[in-house]
Structure formats: structure tokens, C-alpha cells
Amino acid sequence: PGLTLILLVLIPLMWAMPIGLYCSELTNLAPVESGPYVWAKMAFGEFWGFSFGFWMSMAAYLTGSAYVVLAMDYIGLFVSMSPAMIFIIKAAIIILFTIVNLRGLQEVSILSTIFSVIILIAFAAVAFVGMANWQYNPMDPVIPQGEGVMSSWGTGIAVGVWMYCGYVTISFLGGEIENPKVISKGMKLGIVIIALSYILPTLGGIVSTGPWTEWGITIDYSSVLYQHIGPWAGAAFMIVAVIAQFAIFNASIATASRSFMVLGQDNLCPKFLSKVSPKRKV
């Protein structure tokens, strides 16, 4: 648990902040749609620009589908469903958020903001309740007994980097943001809020709910509310966990689609991927 908390502090400073700042500054200097593709093409030529843009778009779509699966996994903890029903609900989720994205970036933004507020309130509750019921030393041990230092750091960094990824995606929307100068300020504030939303609830969970060896197996963030408030609070947090997956999926559709659109306009992808609606320009 100790190493987890250390990495949750270090990785935002050494990984998330540099990526977030360079993406926000470049978006401010060259506010275009599919920014990473355009910037790479400007710096290294069409081949590497296409490669970078295509890889980023594919990664966004593939990881986006994972969030739908995760949402159904959370729902499956409470409701028993057949494989056919699971497939139907997954398809319905995809269709729903595709419709939201077809409405426009403003609608995506409004929904994402609502989701974000709900998520932050839930994690703030975990942090507050956990630290109010402090029972365990969060730094004992720093590294589990019998585990190698290198393997512990390697695994922790790999997971931590994944947790703090995604900041580059804002640059895919640079061409549609009225005032790109706000991105830099928003990015700095966003990274701080995200880091705290990881660090404080994790600290609250470790110090209030044990043993730490059961975290990720039989104990999670919802367990903090379940044990110290009641079953209803734990169930409510699991609903928020589903909402969190919806929020990420909703945003990933918006960002990934912009890259394919610009690639299509440059004749590097099928042209139909660059088609926009005449009314909403989506």
C-alpha cells in the first residue's frame, strides 16, 4: 500500500503533468482538429503523421470498447443476465452515446460535466468516510514482504501510467474550442483534481478497510462506504462506477472520431469517415 500511494503522487508529476502541458500548449499554438496527427505531420512528414494519428485513433476506439465491458461487469455484480441480454445492453449503450455524440460536442460536454460531478462527489465521500475511520498504517508495508523492489515498481508504474493517460485526447478537439487558451489552465486544474481523486480515496480506503492484501480481490472503494455507512452506500458507489465508465466512453467517441475525420479529409482513410452532417457539422 505504501508504494501505491508513493506512485500515485509521483506519476502525476513525472508523467501526467508534462504530457498534459505540452498537449495544451500545442493546442493553444496550433488549434486544429486531430492535433497530434497534424503536429506529427508538420514535424516528421505525412508517413509518421498518419502512423501516429491512426494508432491514436485505433487505441481510443479499442480502449473505449473496454469501458462498455467494464460497465457491464459492474452491472453484473447486482443483476444476473444471460449472454444475449448482456450483448443487447452493450449495444444499447454504444448506440445511446453515439447519438449523444452525433448531437454535437456541446451535448457531449454537458453530459461529461454532469458525470464528472457525480463521480467526484462519490470519491470525495470515500475519502472522507475512510479517513474518518482511520485504523491502519497506510505505509506498512511500503513493498510487500517477499516481493522484489524492481518487480513492485515495474508493476506499479505500468498500472499508474495507464491510470494517468488520456490527457492527449483534448488536443483532438482543438479546432472546435472557441478559446484554446483556456485549455492550459483547465489542464493544470484537471490534473490536480484527478490526482487528488486517486490519492485521497485510495488513502481513505487503505487506512479504514483491511486487510490491504484483499484490495482488488474482496475489497474495493465501495467497501469503504459499505462497511462504515451501510449496504445502500456501497451499492450507490457501484452505480457511480458504472457512470464513470459511461463518462470515459462518451468522451472517447468524441476524440477518436476527429482523428479519422481529418485523416479522411487528407485521403489517408476512407472519405466517408470525414463526412459531416449539414446541420450540426458533426
Q: PLM features: residue spans?
A:
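Membrane-helix boundary/coupling elements in multi-pass transport proteins
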Residues: 32, 55-69, 171-177, 232-271
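Membrane-interface loop-to-helix entry segments
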Residues: 72, 85-136, 147-148, 187-192
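TM-loop-TM module centered on a large, flexible mid-protein loop between adjacent transmembrane helices
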Residues: 38-40, 45, 77-78, 188-252, ...
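Select transmembrane alpha-helical segments in multipass membrane proteins
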Residues: 6-7, 45-58, 90-93, 147-158, ...
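Membrane-interface helix termini and inter-helical loops of multi-pass transporters
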Residues: 72-80, 134-146, 211-219
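Extracellular loop-to-transmembrane helix junctions
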Residues: 1-81, 85-89, 186, 190-196
